[in-house]
Amino acid sequence: GTDFENFVGSVSKIALLGGHLDVNQTGILLYGNATCHIEQDTFRNVMKGVRSTRSSQIIVDNFMNIPTLSPIEATRGIDIDQPVSTYIAENTIFNGYLGISVSGSSAGIVIRDNDLYRSLTAGNNAGINLYRIYGVSLNNRVHDNELEITGGQRAVGISMNNVQELSLIHNTIDFLQTEPLPAGYENAGISGLDVRNSRIRSNYITGSSHYSLREDNVGIIMTNGMANDLFCNETTNMYFGQRYFGPNMVTVLRENKFYDAFRGLELFSPVSLGKQEH
């Protein structure tokens, strides 16, 4: 592979002396029908590791360490928009306001076996971000990813917004704390808004002890979804195990487990309930 390190980019001398990077600093940029296999590369000191628009990409076994410099909200590990095809696997990514982000896809995506380590305090950051993802027969697959979020403050492990036909299986999300990065509020392991015809199964969300004492920390939260199956998911030490808002019609919950939650399951919408354990 190729190492991409210590990019300087088009920044002014004053900003350079201050250690700031240009917001467009990108390790690899793909645009318009590009096809690329990106494997075993190293990305350090870049605002975005890989950025792609309307292209095909296989991104495997890369290392990315995205700096926690201002503006944090502009940083990305892998940022994919309107892909022709996407396969993202076995990457190690430190930080990035969005660690892996895919938007505008109808061709089917695979995100699997990635390790994401996060220690950001900027609100609404997400490890894996999915936006406007469509498909057929559950051809979007996100599985076996491991996320560690330290000192979460309104952080999301896996965020879904306007997503259909997704199989979200066997992901592990751990919320941790240290003395300089204590447990915060309003964190979510898995968050879904307008998610439809999807299967969310066997995901494990765990918080260190203080996360269960902080209001609105939640394992799984779903809003305005439809025709989703959520089963065999397990949450531990979160203030809420699972929460459901809006219609969530034809949604089935079964065999989920909520350990050490202030409230295991909170429903503000009709769902079909199977056996749960709290």
Model regions and ranges:
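Extracellular beta-strand-rich, repetitive "passenger/adhesive" scaffolds
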Residues: G1-L21, H37-T42, D61-P71, I88-T92, ...
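Extracellular beta-strand/beta-solenoid scaffold signature
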Residues: G1-V8, D22-Y31, R44-R54, P67-P83, ...
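Short "repeat-start/strand-capping" segments in structured domains, especially the N-termini
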Residues: S12, N33-H37, R54-I58, P83-Y87, ...
